[in-house]
């Protein structure tokens, strides 16, 4: 698996200061995508043990709120084994940090993914240019995309989780 970006201090992709990984490869190719350079599976550089060590070191700070996984599309089948292992190790070492992930697919299309048990918030849905959100910090590109709270790989239907997701969508 390749990646096109790693940010140790990201404030645009989820709440608080986060570590963000942008993976390479996306077969969806949404019109108006902000990250077209990520479409190729060979873009960027290979994800290695050294890359993972950089992520873990960056996460090992009290002021880092969590980890964000973007792309490309992290839910491409080619990424599943590497990313499931990475997310499992992140959650084992940093159980109090949140994991956010973005996909152009709907929850229904990724509900069996091995990544979901390690994700706290999933932003799902293809980017639709005519529904573009102008507001900075929207955590999603278009209004059709949803912020879905997850618990153990399933949609968290608890009132608290749903209220938090609704507030995130309304606020951002």
Language model features by range: what are they?
Residues 1-6, 17, 35-99, 107-112:
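Conserved Radical SAM active-site core
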Residues 2-29:
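N-terminal pre-triad scaffold of radical SAM enzymes
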Residues 7, 123-126, 151:
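Residues at the C-termini of beta-strands that transition into short coil/loop
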Residues 11, 75, 107, 130, ...:
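Surface-exposed, flexible loop/turn segments at secondary-structure boundaries
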Residues 71, 103-105, 125-127:
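Short secondary-structure boundary segments
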Residues 77-83, 88-91, 132-172:
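P-loop/Walker A phosphate-binding loop and immediately adjacent motor/lid segment at beta-alpha junctions
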Residues 120:
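Receiver (REC) domain switch/active-site residues of two-component response regulators
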């Amino acid at each position: 698996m390749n990646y096109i970006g790693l940010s140790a201090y990201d404030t645009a992709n989820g709440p608080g200061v986060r570590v963000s990984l942008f993976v390479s490869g996306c077969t969806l190719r949404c019109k108006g995508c902000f990250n077209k350079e990520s479409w190729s599976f060979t873009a960027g550089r290979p994800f290695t043990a050294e890359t993972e060590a950089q992520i873990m070191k960056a996460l090992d700070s009290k002021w880092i709120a969590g980890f964000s996984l973007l792309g490309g599309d992290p839910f491409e089948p080619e990424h599943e084994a590497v990313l499931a292992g990475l997310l499992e190790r992140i959650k084992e070492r940093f159980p109090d940090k949140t994991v956010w992930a973005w996909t152009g697919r709907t929850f229904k299309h990724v509900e069996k993914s091995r990544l979901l048990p390690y994700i706290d918030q999933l932003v799902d849905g293809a980017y639709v240019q005519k529904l573009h959100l102008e507001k900075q910090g929207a955590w999603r590109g278009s209004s059709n995309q949803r912020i879905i709270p997850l618990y153990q790989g399933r949609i968290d239907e608890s009132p608290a989780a749903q209220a938090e997701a609704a507030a995130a969508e309304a606020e951002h």
